[in-house]
Amino acid sequence: MKVTAAIFRNGDNVLLMRRGADQPLAGEWEYPGGKFEDGEDGPTCLHRELFEELGIDAEIGDLITIAKHTTDSGKVIELHTYEIKSFTGEIQ
C-alpha cells in the first residue's frame, strides 16, 4: 500500500495529528497524509488528502524520502514523505 505524509515546518516546530479513538492505533501521533488513489502520483495524493483532512490548499514541495515498512500482518507500506512549501486556508 502506498501512502503519503506531509512535513510542515515552522522554525523548530512541525505539525502532527493525533489519531482518533475510532481509528487503528488510536491516540498515536502521525504526520498528515493518506493513501494513494488509483492513478495518483505522490504530490496529487498529498494535496487531496490535506484538503480532505485539514481543509487547506497546500503547495507540495520536494520529496524527502520513500520508506518501506512491513507490518506484523505482512502488509508492505510504502511511505512517500514531502515537504510542504506553503498553504492557504486555516487548518481545521
What are these regions (language model features)?
Residues 1-15, 35:
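Conserved N-terminal beta-strand and adjoining loop/helix that marks the start
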Residues 23-27:
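A conserved beta-turn-beta hairpin within the catalytic core of GNAT-like acetyltransferases
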Residues 31-64:
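The catalytic Nudix box helix
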